[in-house]
Amino acid sequence: YSYTTIHRPEHSIDSLVSEAVIGKFPYYKTGFHIYNLPTNTPTEWGWNPENLCDGNLETGWHTGEGSGGKLPHQMTFELDRPTELHTFKIYQRAQDDWAFRAGNPKKYTLWGTNSLPAEDGSDEGWTMLGEFQSVKPSGLPVGTLTDADIAYARAGESYDIPEVGVFRYLRIKVLESWGGEQAVHFMELEFFGIPHEETGINDSNI
């Protein structure tokens, strides 16, 4: 949004118009849960996909090279309410020396739809909202980390969504892992935008 102010000094015949001030409405963190489909990649090691939306950075989702098959691996979600999505954040596995290696996502796509997802889990009716890539601040080879790399990973990687729209269902597809493994692990996802229902908004989620 943008706005200007107009002021007419006393005894003046002209009004003074300020330069336009440009701002953004606040984005809210939307709740979500797993939407079960047969094409959701199976879990291994007891790292269930529900961990991606529990607010706990010590738990996460882990697929396997065996049950999951080759990449891409994917998971489907239902938002608590239709939301005009603008940004999202992904927290990779960054405890100890895990950041930017092994099954942490390196390249991935995000998809959205408002239609009830097909029971066969196909992409019919879905819109790709963007392609995203994790970037290691130091640029050093896999297995070598700086303090800045670790801090960046633990803070979560934020992305603007290029195809802004109102969606109820989301799907993430991991195309490539940092370690080149055919398995995926990360800890948490967060989605931010503008709710499109007239229900109350929980300000604690800002």
Segments the model singles out, each with a brief description of its role:
Residues Y1-Y27:
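Activation corresponds to long, low-complexity, non-globular regions
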Residues Y3-T5, T127-Q133, I206:
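Short amphipathic beta-strand/extended segments with alternating polar/hydrophobic composition
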Residues H7-L16, E44-D123, A155-N205:
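Aromatic, loop-rich ligand-recognition surfaces of beta-strand-rich domains
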Residues Y35-N36, C53-G55, S134, L140:
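Amphipathic alpha-helical interaction segments
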Residues E124-D160:
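Extracellular carbohydrate recognition and processing domains
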